[in-house]
């Protein structure tokens, strides 16, 4: 188990020919982590010198989310951290001639790691320890002074929506407060650990879920990790393919960041 770091410079600032709008191009750094005999890449894109906006993407099949984050950061500056995984949701690795698979948004607690390994029929104590080290590796790449971590995710039709958090929904016990706008697509919503963010976004008439930080199931998700530590986190969850909508919802967060 181990890692090394390689930095690749691809940084620049450009101005539009039609106006004075600044466009940032990222400085890309690739961090490598050896999980069993498999090398996992964690990429970090830094747009300009703005460290106040930090985003993360854990599922490499959620391409719209990454495209939306990059599109916004070109204008605002900031940081995007993402797992590179050949456009696959589950991370696979080999350990002692056996293959393991896990959901990278279920690795931030021991119970979450065990559950995701068993779900994918690939559990062992040694694999749990390896993934715990990888989770720590990911957390350490998030700047320690990040005020609010912005996660970007995509869902598919009928897989996850704001309705999943209503009474009788799959995740109703994880919810402290819920704001549903009937005029909004139920697949598009914010999910946050921060009550201030919840109230601000609710007042702007978006679908918003406030996590029950103390009682939410410790499923290994990054939201629960942040919630248990009273840290500010917000996920921008949008239906796959809705690039403009996800970009707009990210921009809303950034425009209101000074109110959080």
Residue ranges of model-derived segments:
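Bacterial Sec-dependent N-terminal signal peptides
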Residues: 1-18
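Structured catalytic-domain cores with a bias toward divalent-metal coordination
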Residues: 17-260
């Amino acid at each position: 188990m181990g890692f090394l770091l390689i930095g690749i410079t691809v940084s620049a600032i450009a101005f539009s020919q039609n106006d004075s709008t600044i466009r940032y191009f990222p400085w890309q750094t690739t961090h490598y982590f050896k999980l069993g005999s498999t090398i996992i890449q964690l990429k970090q894109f830094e747009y300009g010198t703005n460290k106040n906006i930090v985003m993360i993407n854990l599922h490499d099949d959620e391409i719209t989310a990454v495209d939306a984050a990059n599109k916004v950061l070109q204008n605002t500056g900031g940081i995007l951290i993402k797992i590179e995984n050949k456009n696959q949701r589950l991370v696979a690795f080999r350990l002692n001639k056996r293959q393991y698979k896990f959901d990278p948004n279920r690795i931030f607690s021991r119970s979450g790691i065990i559950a995701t390994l068993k779900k994918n029929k690939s559990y062992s104590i040694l694999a749990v320890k390896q993934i715990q080290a990888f989770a720590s590796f990911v957390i350490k790449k998030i700047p320690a002074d990040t005020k609010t971590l912005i996660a970007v995710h995509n869902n598919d039709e009928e897989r996850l929506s704001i309705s999943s958090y209503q009474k009788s929904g799959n995740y109703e016990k994880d919810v402290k407060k819920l704001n549903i706008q009937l005029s909004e697509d139920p697949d598009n919503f914010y999910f946050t650990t921060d009550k201030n963010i919840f109230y601000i976004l609710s007042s702007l008439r978006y679908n918003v879920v406030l996590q029950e930080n103390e009682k939410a199931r410790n499923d290994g998700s990054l939201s629960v990790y942040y919630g248990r530590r009273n840290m500010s986190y917000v996920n921008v969850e949008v239906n796959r393919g809705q690039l403009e909508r996800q970009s707009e919802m990210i921009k809303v967060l950034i425009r209101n960041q000074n109110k959080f």
